Design a protein with these regions (language model features):
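Acidic catalytic loop of the alpha/beta-hydrolase fold
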Residues: 100, 229-234
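C-terminal catalytic histidine-bearing segment of alpha/beta-hydrolase fold enzymes
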Residues: 200, 204-207, 233, 240-285
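Primarily recognizes the serine-hydrolase "nucleophile elbow" in alpha/beta-hydrolase
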Residues: 46-117
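Alpha/beta-hydrolase active-site loop
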Residues: 30-53
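Cap/lid segment of the alpha/beta-hydrolase catalytic domain
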Residues: 1-38
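Accessory cap/linker subdomain of secreted extracellular hydrolases
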Residues: 97-216
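Loop/turn elements at helix/coil->beta-strand transitions in domains of secreted/extracellular proteins
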Residues: 9-15, 58-62, 86-90, 219-222, ...
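Short beta-strand/loop motif that positions the catalytic acidic residue
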Residues: 219, 224-231
Length: 285
């Protein structure tokens, strides 16, 4: 809200579209680049049309700003900006989600040597993300079954991803593990969560490698990225890999700003910097 207020005060029109499947029929296709990008570009065009019908004229210039899944969406909008047939000026992405497969694998490795309660926290986060992935896949493949990814004991929790957001899912996975810990001698040994090698399931693999990964094609407009060194939700390693892969296909990252922020403070600590970035990319008229 602080960012939006400051952008409005600077003279910008702010459009905040929601994602497909949130507040509309159907399942939300979590971290689907194309879905997010279409939501944004359609919203920008619709907003300009709405304002012009009321004799409120706006510039054809526009930028995207987003944090976390919103940062992921902002990068997707950069790829599909030409759909709007306007004048796209650039992207500011804060802790943008990417390389979810790597995040899941690295999380499992980290949990392997962690204490039981650290394991619980890590596993709950990983399983909440995985549940949202499966729900998103079911948007276009309704026959896809949670049991192809989860075990019987966790699939019932994962199904909640079709109606709940990340935090409630996290809480449910965590609570179930807590009961197991309390009744199994303070250990998670023997607790089964996901099917072996589920990331090799074709629909999951396609999602992780292709559908969810931003900047797989060259983007020629400016890109500014903020990343927290203490971020455990979108680790710096994931963003480093995103930038490396983007550079390989010819995309230039104009600025990569890092600091001692976690996932939330990467955004809250940089509101004024982001407003300044927007003014640089698209000076107010």
């Amino acid at each position: 809200k602080d960012l939006i207020s400051k952008l409005l005060a600077a003279g910008y029109v702010v459009v905040a579209p929601d994602y497909e499947g949130l507040g509309t029929p159907g399942i939300h296709p979590f971290l689907n680049v194309k879905s997010e990008a279409f939501s944004i570009t359609d919203a920008v065009v619709a907003t300009r049309n709405y304002l012009s019908q009321r004799n409120l004229l706006t510039s054809k210039k526009w930028v995207t700003v987003g944090h976390s899944q919103g940062g992921h969406a902002a990068l997707g909008a950069a790829q599909y900006a030409s759909r709007a047939q306007l004048d796209y000026k650039g992207t500011v992405a804060v802790a943008p989600a990417s390389n979810l497969g790597s995040i899941l694998l690295n999380g499992e490795l980290k949990a392997a040597s962690a204490s039981v309660y650290e394991k619980k926290a890590i596993y709950a986060q990983l399983d909440a993300f995985t549940a949202l992935v499966v729900a998103g896949i079911r948007n276009t493949h309704p026959d896809f079954n949670y049991l192809q990814v989860f075990t019987e004991s966790t699939a019932r929790i994962a199904q909640g991803a079709e109606g709940f957001c990340y935090e409630p899912l996290l809480g449910d996975f965590s609570a179930t593990m807590q009961v197991y810990i309390a009744t199994h001698g303070e250990t998670l040994d023997g607790y089964t969560r996901t099917q072996p090698n589920f990331m090799a399931v074709p629909l999951v693999k396609t999602f992780l490698d292709k559908d969810s990964q931003p900047l797989q094609v060259k983007v020629t407009t400016p890109i500014i990225i903020y990343q927290g060194l203490a971020d455990s939700t979108v680790p710096k390693l994931a963003t480093d890999l995103l930038i490396s892969n983007a550079t390989t296909v010819g995309t230039k990252i104009n600025s990569y700003v890092t600091g001692n922020w976690d996932h939330g403070t990467a955004m809250s600590s940089n509101v004024d910097n982001i407003v300044a970035d927007v003014k640089t990319l698209m000076p107010p008229q």
